[in-house]
């Protein structure tokens, strides 16, 4: 088994990359892919860069060059579910774009033409993540994660997203693009991110302060998931 792991930023991948054994690096078009073994599993760790285009391009490179059996998207997110606090975990049941709008042609908010309304995470990977959450005794929410090319900060964009997607649990900038590419490649995926900020008017300050906390928590989750997969054989 080979596991693809995707993080957008240096802070989101460095703790994992530094632990990869027999590490090799592929650099292409602004992306970096690190291959080797981590916690007993063959891995391909992608640092994609920020935003939907970077995430889609990087995920495509990852799937084409490394052919992982599954993909886990790690990193940070802004919490919209009222029960989420900094350091808590959000697990995707599905991902959607919050900044796509072709509703004039009968599509749902966030739905791209010719695509499903949402990209649905793999149930087995969701169960794996939730099992690890219980083992680690972390607070977590399973729900909708919405992505767009904007850092959500302030009442107006928050209200717009909540109005269009009432069940949204968290927002960030890559997960829907990753889910979109995995859907096209028929590769199972799940998003497991830690909360770095509660999306509000001061979220940019919280993000800068707590990104490292979120990175440590999401790394803890990835390592636990890999260990469980290795034990299953």
From Swiss-Prot:
Keywords: Amino-acid biosynthesis, Hydrolase, Methionine biosynthesis. GO terms for biological process: L-methionine salvage from methylthioadenosine; L-methionine salvage from S-adenosylmethionine; purine deoxyribonucleoside catabolic process. Pfam families: PNP_UDP_1 (PF01048). The active site is at residues 12, 197. Its EC number is 3.2.2.9. Pathway: Amino-acid biosynthesis; L-methionine biosynthesis via salvage pathway; S-methyl-5-thio-alpha-D-ribose 1-phosphate from S-methyl-5'-thioadenosine (hydrolase route): step 1/2. It catalyses: S-adenosyl-L-homocysteine + H2O = S-(5-deoxy-D-ribos-5-yl)-L-homocysteine + adenine; S-methyl-5'-thioadenosine + H2O = 5-(methylsulfanyl)-D-ribose + adenine; 5'-deoxyadenosine + H2O = 5-deoxy-D-ribose + adenine. InterPro entries: MTA_SAH_Nsdase, Nucleoside_phosphorylase_d, Nucleoside_phosphorylase_sf. HAMAP family: Salvage_MtnN. PANTHER family: 5'-METHYLTHIOADENOSINE/S-ADENOSYLHOMOCYSTEINE NUCLEOSIDASE (PTHR46832), 5'-METHYLTHIOADENOSINE_S-ADENOSYLHOMOCYSTEINE NUCLEOSIDASE (PTHR46832:SF1). Belongs to the PNP/UDP phosphorylase family. MtnN subfamily. Catalyzes the irreversible cleavage of the glycosidic bond in both 5'-methylthioadenosine (MTA) and S-adenosylhomocysteine (SAH/AdoHcy) to adenine and the corresponding thioribose, 5'-methylthioribose and S-ribosylhomocysteine, respectively. Also cleaves 5'-deoxyadenosine, a toxic by-product of radical S-adenosylmethionine (SAM) enzymes, into 5-deoxyribose and adenine. Thus, is required for in vivo function of the radical SAM enzymes biotin synthase and lipoic acid synthase, that are inhibited by 5'-deoxyadenosine accumulation. Homodimer. This is 5'-methylthioadenosine/S-adenosylhomocysteine nucleosidase.
């Amino acid at each position: 088994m080979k596991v693809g792991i995707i993080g957008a930023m240096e802070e989101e991948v460095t703790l994992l990359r530094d632990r990869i054994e027999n590490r090799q690096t592929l650099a292409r078009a602004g992306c970096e892919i690190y291959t080797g073994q981590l916690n007993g599993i063959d891995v391909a760790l992608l640092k994609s860069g920020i935003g939907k285009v970077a995430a889609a391009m990087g995920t495509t490179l990852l799937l084409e060059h490394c052919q992982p059996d599954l993909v886990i998207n790690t990193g940070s997110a802004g919490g919209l579910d009222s029960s989420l606090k900094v350091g808590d975990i959000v697990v995707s049941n599905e991902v959607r774009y919050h900044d796509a709008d072709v509703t004039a042609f009968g599509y749902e908010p966030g739905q791209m033409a010719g695509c499903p309304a949402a990209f649905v995470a793999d149930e087995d990977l969701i169960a794996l993540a939730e099992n690890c959450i219980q083992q680690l005794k972390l607070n977590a929410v399973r729900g909708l994660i919405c992505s767009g090319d904007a850092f959500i900060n302030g009442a107006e964009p928050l209200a717009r997203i909540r109005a269009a997607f009432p069940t949204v649990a968290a927002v960030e900038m890559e997960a829907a693009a990753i889910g979109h590419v995995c859907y096209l490649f028929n590769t199972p995926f799940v998003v497991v991110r830690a909360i770095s900020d509660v999306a509000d008017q001061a979220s940019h300050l919280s993000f800068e302060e707590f990104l490292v906390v979120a990175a440590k928590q999401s790394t803890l989750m990835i390592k636990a998931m890999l260990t469980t997969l290795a034990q299953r054989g």
